[in-house]
Each structure stands twice: as C-alpha cells, then as structure tokens.
C-alpha cells in the first residue's frame, strides 16, 4: 500500500477508520481512550489498522482521530504512521466519518470502506467478501442475523411485546459504498444538520442507496465496555505467547578531580577536598545513567544530545541531561522499571548520602524509591581511582516499552 501523499494512480478502494471517540462507556485508563488501550500487547487501533494495511485490496487508508490524540496515535502506530493519512475528527461519529471521506476527495477512490476503530478483529476473509460484493450502485453491509429473542418494553418497564426476529440483523463494519454517493449523502445530512444516523448504512438508506447485506463475522466484535477490552486482551494472550519489550541499557562515565570543595553525585552536593572536572557540573552518576536510559532507545549518548563543544552547557546541572533522556523514554511509551548506579571511588564515602541521592533520582525520573539502587565500591587502591585522581560510575537502566519483541 502506498502512502496517500505518494499515490500516483487513482485508488480503487480506500478505507476510512473512525477513531475519534472518547470511549466513555469503557471507563478511564492511563492509556487513553479505548482505541489506545492495549490488547495482546498492542493498541486496539494499531491492531485494527493492521488488518487494512495487510489487505492487498485496499489502496489507501485515512484514519480519523481526536485532535488531542496525535501523540497517542503516533505512539500506538510507530512504524506505520507514514503510510496512513491522519485527519482530525468532529464532535460525533457521523461528523468524523464525513471529514474522513472529504480527506479522500483528491484521491477519488471508486469505493470506500468505513470501519470502527474499535473493531480490531476484522478478518481478511470478511474484507475480501465485502469487496467481492461491491457494485457501482450498491453498498455492502456485513451483519449477523439476530439470534436472541427481542422484547419491547412498556413505559413502566414491563414487557409490551415480543418482536419477531425474522429478517432482523445486527449491523457490523466495515460498511462499503461507492465513494461519491456516500460522500454526497453525508454532505446532504450535514447541510441540513441531520446528525441522528447511527451508522453509514442508515445514511445510505436515507438517500435511497441500495445496501446489500452479507454475512458478517461473530469474531468482528466492537469493543464498547471495559469488560470487552479485558476479554479481547485475554483472548489474544491465550492465542499468542508474547515476549514483552523489556530493554536494558548500560552507561559508564569517569571524571578527574581538580581543586575545589565539593562534588555533585546524582544531584546531591557532597563536601569534599576536591571537585570533579567537567564541562557541566561533572555529575558522573547522572552522566552514566543518562547514557543508560538513552541506550534503551538506541538514541546515542549524552555527547550526541549535549555536545561538550557547545558553550550553553558550560556548568549546566546534569539534571537537565537525565530528564531529557527520561522524556525520550516516555515519549516512546516506555516505563522505567529500575535504575542502578555504582560509584567506583576511594572518597568521598557514598553511604551517608545514599538516601538523598535516591530521593533526588526519584524526583528526576518520577519513579518509586524501590526502583532505585545506588551502590559504591573502591578500586582496592589500584589505578587512577585507587590513587584518588577521580571517580567512575557504572549505570544500568531497565525500561519496559509497549508491544513485544518481534520474532
């Protein structure tokens, strides 16, 4: 599939994935709205989009998201962001769909499939059958015959009547249509402020566009409630043994002594007969830990981001460096699970200041004290450390990233 911006031929079939909702019925989550909740190690929306990315019958994809969700979207999609056109949605699903259809106008597809972003189990077989049933004057609606007995209630909550279920179907998505007629139908509804249609087939019906019903898929469920998401996650984890993306980075730094009256280690000033020589504040512990965090993203080292040749970092507090590295980790969805710093030094003694260093690292990284380890050892009077010419530090960071280790 080509990125829309690079398309050189008219697309035959496009897909609009509607994912701009707030998902209030699914409850609140630190991961964001339900389309960004994780099932089987990946975001719901990422799994939904993958079905269309992998479908050779689909030429172009537009995804409609909430204006506030761009960071969540990029974090969820990662590698596939460049192949999909992203547009901001509106206040309702109907308005978001219209905006998605409008985004395709310059690419003039012959047909368009419109799909809920929270139906992550759409199959290649269903997509194929939808395409096989497309016609220039008809839409296609996957649906399942209603199997439950339907009751209509009276105003007092008692049963008024049993509704015959013969000929009744539960609609699914993707719903597919000739592109121009369904866009025109949405534009007409918008022009007269009609926003009460519950799906695109209803708008097509309103405009006398024939819609053919085909058999849907029982697996093609919509994730509406928090329990739906939990069940989807359980289902995927039963079907697939995944290896979480846990990464470990190491860092090493050394600074020599020069005349002075204190050293700064892990953000804590410690009185000493000398200070450490460096372009910044020479905090050897934070420098090593900054490199360790950057290593978990393959993001170079501290010199890449803060070159010692740059005068703006002269005398700078190393807190700036480690918070920058932590932000890089978090922007990629990473969670810092553990950090460990070992100082190699004859003096000063680290033990009396360990608690203060731990507290400082907790504040800089936003993690609990039991995820921070600070240790020290001597060099048994060997080498430059043994001669009290400087201090070295070794740091290790463990970070958990979204997704899993690829096979």
UniProtKB/Swiss-Prot annotation:
Name of the protein in its database record: Bifunctional enzyme IspD/IspF
Disulfide bonds: none
Highest rank taxon of the organism: Bacteria
Annotated stretches, region: 2-C-methyl-D-erythritol 4-phosphate cytidylyltransferase: 1-246
Residues the record lists as binding 4-CDP-2-C-methyl-D-erythritol 2-phosphate: 253-255, 279-280, 301-303, 377-380, 384, 387
Cofactors that this protein relies on: a divalent metal cation
Annotated SUPFAM superfamilies: IpsF-like, Nucleotide-diphospho-sugar transferases
GO molecular function, one term: 2-C-methyl-D-erythritol 2,4-cyclodiphosphate synthase activity
Catalysed reactions, as listed in the record: 2-C-methyl-D-erythritol 4-phosphate + CTP + H(+) = 4-CDP-2-C-methyl-D-erythritol + diphosphate; 4-CDP-2-C-methyl-D-erythritol 2-phosphate = 2-C-methyl-D-erythritol 2,4-cyclic diphosphate + CMP
Protein keywords: Isoprene biosynthesis, Lyase, Metal-binding, Multifunctional enzyme, Nucleotidyltransferase, Transferase
Biological function: Bifunctional enzyme that catalyzes the formation of 4-diphosphocytidyl-2-C-methyl-D-erythritol from CTP and 2-C-methyl-D-erythritol 4-phosphate (MEP) (IspD), and catalyzes the conversion of 4-diphosphocytidyl-2-C-methyl-D-erythritol 2-phosphate (CDP-ME2P) to 2-C-methyl-D-erythritol 2,4-cyclodiphosphate (ME-CPP) with a corresponding release of cytidine 5-monophosphate (CMP) (IspF).
